[in-house]
């Protein structure tokens, strides 16, 4: 599943200093505003009410000896196949509810004798047949015991069938059910999405099963290791199209009502429940055939398809599929690849096997109004989801504790697949900014977590949802990139192909991948490792955090320590490796590559590679940032690197120019170098025109903005940034012929946005005039937008910030009338840039009205308001006052709470704010925090670190900005 961003996912080019930095995470991890009713849906006369004695007490009071009180399924029964018939009703019933009805037959094998059948079921009402919710029969002569009773256990989401006798080990059985569920607009399970076609409201029935919502669609053994085959048969209105994982086998009229069509799909391969998908809609498609005869189709609203918005996704899908087939040395496993853009969708995208679902913004692209970043998002998200068709779908992790392997791998190779489709963009470099740098801010906390956790620590749906975080996606991608780098890509691919061939249609744990990579290493002699793949990688997978590698060039000593943002924080999570890593250290001396060195799990060692003599000689470590660690140096080497940057920066690779800035600011935050040293590393930017160093600087300085934009430091800081960015602003003004054309390269187009956003937000009058004039031209002629799509996010935001009610109302009207989601998203984020308190308060109220802001966008909009220094207090008051309602409406397992807590607390840096946050935690212990539990602990830790950092650095920072802004 695409993070959507997490999100996002994630370009980091939308003007961090404008106060919308929260969007970088949100795009990746955009989340659902749930309104699923806590009570059960109204029941038809034939439906049994939910068991009035269904378990609902806290898990701690339950008898854990009873298997239906445990969240994990017993291993007594293994599913073989399902036959599922579903009929969604796309207009409300007499109670005003949208519903679906269904029937299911599951065939399963008894592995161990048992007198109980436990199968997942969530918010389904069952037809009583022969006195029970299920009918059980034997297969091939086996005789089932009689049913004693059935019950629904709400807390653990089970349908439990108690038997009068034992099921026999080795025998097969079939169980039939008939049921009804609500086709709710909660973005989970089998749900309803809506859109307008002219003045007509259209309804789509669609699915989102990951991680634990297939059970909301039909009763199933809803764990990833419980693979089976599926026969899916939707019954749908005649004029609608049904889609599923496979191609249709037949489509016939429903005998009793020809206005309905029965579409039966071919049997799926053996697969996990979370990868199922079925959709009923009036969407249309465009189609192509890949060189390997795979049918490729892009589906969306008819108007989007007719206007060509699916063409770019269609163009890149074939090349990306071919790239991965070659990369994995494994053919694409299915006959077709459908991809569909949905108006309402929780995540960025979902890798359902053969039927990938997307937010419209992650699939559709209009060259007339979409920006280059929108285009990059499409190609990278498509690559991410298609990578999963092999790694995750064909071979699946055994349990969610190894989710990092699925999502980290896809988050790494998405850059490779996208780079193949767009070879001139240099997309592979962006993984450093988008993934590695961003996740280190989280992984440097004592409340971080390892990539892989013991399986018994991940049980509930909320615990599973909590794993869909930046550690899983971005750290996973970063350490796999490091592994591929020190193995070489060829060896990595060889081991990967062996892994996929061995475990096709099966489940694995991460150790299985290590074993096959080790076999590839053992088959050759050119690459020699200091230890086994497992011994090296377990230190990166099983312990949280990462090292700071310190190179002392005066004596050649190289050492490592667990990097913590707050070095005084208490690390309570033990490590079998004592927080020491086996670290691959690449380096250069004065621009010349040195041989690779391994820091072999020891705290320090000495080597002449790292000793430097002479006033002008320097060492640079972690070339192209292939290693997942930060680098510190002795003061003399830092000064020499700064001199090199200010005299001839091109000697240092552009990625490492970004690394020097990023690492120094992080080291300063952890009090390992003076904050003035980190600030000195930005002095060369006055002559820098490359995107990556500028983006690293703006991302790092955004922390200073968050800490100081309410204090006297902010004025000198703005003056310094204005001075540094002015040459960049003039550079892009010149090469774009006074902003009338766009730069040639992707990186330059991104840095043009940085130039304008930074210039405007730091008071350069020419920039403010530019954006105000462009916005006024649009207001004067709303049907003719003169603002280039690349520049719209930053122009909209700055014009609204500089303007008042008139500008805001105009943008709101344009948002309400926007027909393309990319344009709507730009306007939605920009509306949070207002400097008027009452306008922001009004906008905040709109987020709870789904007629104004779609539920999928509510949380990200709240976060955008919180990222505005004026809106942050409004949102924090709102969250404190409404936490219980938000928790009930959004759902305890939603991804939204982690993002919401991070966004609203990111400026906290005073004792008063810490006390407020601690009181908030105490006040809501009974309600709970769901998937935001870890984020709350991280927010408390981050706030304490912020308080300490501000106290220790404020005076020095004020003095530095004052001295360097002249």
Swiss-Prot record:
The reply to whether Transmembrane helix figures as a keyword in the UniProt entry is yes
Q: Which residues lie on this side of the membrane: Extracellular?
A: 33-966
Record-linked Gene3D superfamilies? 1.25.50.20, 2.60.40.1910, Neutral Protease Domain 2 (1.10.390.10), tricorn interacting facor f3 domain (2.60.40.1730)
One biological process term in Gene Ontology: peptide catabolic process
Q: Where is this site: Transition state stabilizer?
A: 473
Keywords attached to this Swiss-Prot or TrEMBL record, sorted alphabetically, are: Aminopeptidase, Angiogenesis, Cell membrane, Developmental protein, Differentiation, Disulfide bond, Glycoprotein, Hydrolase, Membrane, Metal-binding, Metalloprotease, Phosphoprotein, Protease, Signal-anchor, Sulfation, Transmembrane, Transmembrane helix, Zinc
User: What's the protein here called?
Assistant: Aminopeptidase N
